[in-house]
């Protein structure tokens, strides 16, 4: 009967329900159940006093709200809600702003986005197939050697005029 629904329980009278901002919203807004101050350049755990049960094959990703990121420099961290977790949903807020960020009870602080996942069997092997990329990581697929091109632009004077 409830198999494909996103189910939730309010763990206190301070919890808000899951709210979609619009009919086409990908996420469900999560609201703070208690007031919290996130210090400037600091972080805080904000409890929602909600427990959830995801439909089969889905997990929850706690994502930032774009307005908080743009206007208040607030971001969200460590945002995976495993489908078998039944505890109080907490949201880690990072404040990249110069002023403390005050969260009031009921403030929408993040959104819960449901995503499909797979859990294939795990197999330890002696080696992996080779690829053209190999073990090149961290920027290896970006635009060439950007720092050399930038330096050449500055040293030739081409870019200096853009910044004056």
Curated annotation (Swiss-Prot):
Its family remark reads: Belongs to the dUTPase family.
Q: Which GO terms describe its molecular function?
A: dUTP diphosphatase activity; magnesium ion binding
The top EC class, named as a word, is hydrolase
> Which positions does UniProt annotate for substrate binding?
65-67, 79-82, 90, 138-139
Tell me the Gene Ontology biological-process terms attached to this UniProt entry. dUMP biosynthetic process; dUTP catabolic process
Q: What is the lineage of its organism?
A: Viruses, Varidnaviria, Bamfordvirae, Nucleocytoviricota, Megaviricetes
Which reaction is catalysed here?
A: dUTP + H2O = dUMP + diphosphate + H(+)
- What is the name listed in the Swiss-Prot or TrEMBL entry for this protein? Putative deoxyuridine 5'-triphosphate nucleotidohydrolase
List of residues that carry N6-acetyllysine: 71
Function comment:
This enzyme is involved in nucleotide metabolism: it produces dUMP, the immediate precursor of thymidine nucleotides and it decreases the intracellular concentration of dUTP so that uracil cannot be incorporated into DNA.
| Keywords from the UniProt entry | Acetylation, Hydrolase, Magnesium, Metal-binding, Nucleotide metabolism
Protein's UniProt keywords contain Acetylation? yes
Cofactor dependence is on:
Mg(2+)
Might you give the EC number(s) for this enzyme? 3.6.1.23
